[in-house]
Amino acid sequence: MARSAFFFHCVAAVAACIAATAAALSGTATFYGGSDASGTMGGACGYGNLYSTGYGTNTAALSSALFNDGAACGECYQITCDQSNSKWCKAGTSVTITATNLCPPDYSKPSNDGGWCNPPRQHFDMAQPAWEQIGVYRGGIVPVNFQRVSCTRKGGVRFTINGNSYFELVLITNVGGPGSIKSVQIKGTKTGWVTMSRNWGANWQANNYLNNQAISFSVTSTAGKTLVFEDVAPSNWQFGQTFTSGVQFY
C-alpha cells in the first residue's frame, strides 16, 4: 500500500489563481469516440483507460495551439456553446472537460473546412458524450466559449512507475487544482533529488537505479504549488504498479 504524501510548500492558491486569471475565450468544438467514448481511450497524454484512471467521458483532444506539446495534459476547461453563432447549441448548458489527447493538425484541409485543429485555431475535439451536453448531434461543429477552471478529483495524485532498472518512466494522473504539471523531481532513499524531464504527455522520465528503495516525488504544478510525496512508493515497488497519494493540489 502506498504511504501518504506530505505537503511541502505552496507559492500559489491554486483554485483562486485559476478562477481569477482565466478569462473566457472563443473557439470551436467537434466530437469523436462514439456514444460511449470508447474511441477516446489512450491518447497523447498517456492516460490509457480513461474510465479506470478516473477521467471518464468528459474529456477532449486539444488542438496543438492549446495542447502545448503535452504541457496541457490534465487541465480542465469549462465549455459553453455560443448560441449567438449557432442554431445547434443546447441553451443554458456547459460542460467541464479534461484535456486527455491531442487533436493533430490536418494541413491537407483548410482550417475553416475540416482542418479544425490546424494552428492557430483553439479547438476542442470532445468525447461525444461531453459534446452532446452542449450541442445537437446534427451540428457536427459548434462555436464555443471556454475558460480554464480548477479540476476536482477523487482521491490523491497517482504515480504509475514504468520503465526498467535504469530508466524510470512515471505517469502522473488524477491531478487536482490546475490539473497540469510544470516540473517533477524523483528521489530514492539512497539518492538525492533528480530532476525529471517530460517524455511525452503526462509521462516523466529519469535515469536512476532505484530498485529496492522507497521512492519520493517533488511535483510542481503549473500554478506554482509544490508538493513532496514522501515515500509514496514503498521499497518493494514493482514496475507497472500505481501508487495513490493522500493529498491533492488544493
Swiss-Prot record:
Topology in the lipid bilayer: Peripheral membrane protein
Record-linked SUPFAM superfamilies: Barwin-like endoglucanases, PHL pollen allergen
Transmembrane feature ranges: none
Any Gene Ontology CC annotation: extracellular region
Biological-process GO terms, alphabetical: plant-type cell wall loosening
Keywords associated with the record: Cell wall, Cell wall biogenesis/degradation, Membrane, Secreted, Signal
Domain of life: Eukaryota
Compartments (UniProt record): Secreted, Cell wall; Membrane
Expansin-like EG45 domain segment(s): 42-156
Tissue expression: Expressed in roots.
Positions of the Expansin-like CBD domain: 166-245
CDD domains: DPBB_EXPA_N
InterPro entries documented for this protein: Expan_Lol_pI, Expansin, Expansin/allergen_DPBB_dom, Expansin_CBD, Expansin_CBD_sf, RlpA-like_DPBB, RlpA-like_sf
Span of the signal peptide: 1-24
Family: Belongs to the expansin family. Expansin A subfamily.
Annotated function: May cause loosening and extension of plant cell walls by disrupting non-covalent bonding between cellulose microfibrils and matrix glucans. No enzymatic activity has been found. May be required for rapid internodal elongation in deepwater rice during submergence.
Protein name, UniProt field: Expansin-A12
Organism listed in the record: Oryza sativa subsp. japonica
